[in-house]
Amino acid sequence: CFILGGGMVTDLGGLAASSFKRGIAYINVPTTLLAMVDASVGGKTGINFNGLKNEIGVFAPAACVLLETEFLRSLDAHNFFSGYAEMLKHGLISTPEHLAELLAFDTEKIDYALLKSMVGRSVQVKERIVEEDPLEHGIRKALNLGHTVGLAFESLALAERRPVLHGY
């Protein structure tokens, strides 16, 4: 089973794959920057329910994640910065050098070769934390930096039928 799309699609697809026949293997092919550095790694899948974010979900890691950064050339600025914000968070919880590289990145004139390596590094940061704490009982909570408050804003925006992007 291949799941091709942004974070909403990979979340829904991962949840469906984990439920179908009590779980089938799936391969994530994320197409947005946020999906590449966040939703595609770690196996947290979920859907909104009753006006609340990610109320129904499971931990169901993909058997494989295929990252093709050529998809990123099609992103508008809004979607690019949604994912870039997540990468900055990874820089904050990683090394000063990683954060400096992210902060020095020219978002006005995107170097896609450099972005590809930065995506890889961001994914490695998340993978390292997820491997240490797969079910989010300890260090993995660092990945939620901003999410706790952010989810409250997202839920409010959903209730008012004015959804916002997850990465901001």
What is the role of each PLM region?
Residues 1-3, 25:
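Glycine-rich phosphate-binding loops that contact phosphosugars or nucleotide phosphates
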Residues 4-6, 145-146:
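Glycine-rich beta-strand-to-loop/alpha-helix junction loops that act as flexible
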Residues 11, 49, 55, 128, ...:
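Short leucine-rich amphipathic alpha-helices used at interfaces
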Residues 12, 69, 145-148:
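Generic detector of well-ordered alpha-helical packing
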Residues 14-107:
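A glycine/threonine-rich phosphate-anchoring loop and its flanking beta-alpha core
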Residues 105-168:
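Active-site segments that bind and position negatively charged phosphate/pyrophosphate groups
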